[in-house]
């Protein structure tokens, strides 16, 4: 089951009917009261990896493009990202106060609102040197806005994204990102579901957290004085 948000507890109806449930890409807020199996990616680690990369490249003024904060996965990506900067004495959330927060609630809205918000961001008197998109949909909106404004990545601004997309590799400056193993998520979920169907609940509730993969590509400008861009390959 793929819940719509953190507070989506409709899975209880299935459980009450005796139907085994495995949640994908989410740990529901009602987990304490209504336990359920979950298969997710290590969202916190993914956010942290991207933050470490930006810091290594000298980026201290970074904007986080949010997408539907009412979700465990998004919250963890942002938390991992923010914590890395916090440990290095930089309060990113305080920097965010310079701009109104943005939250997107649907697929279409995410792309559109990301586009509009990015336009306002680059027109501000003190724009960031890098933007962290916490999902590929918000990145699509940002890329569209950058193209419309004739902004060059990474010469004018740097991008990183949690999630990968085939389009990212075709860009003139391929997007630096963290990817999830969606095939593995599906496989683990099916294996866990079959286990429950056969009556084995010895490890219930189980949270199966899968690793993510970091792809340092060319969308981050090096402000540290070593190189002009990242030189990593996918």
Set out the residue ranges of the language-model regions:
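Active-site core of PLP-dependent enzymes with the aminotransferase class I/II
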Residues: 5
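Bacterial carbohydrate/catabolite-sensing allosteric modules
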Residues: 8-234
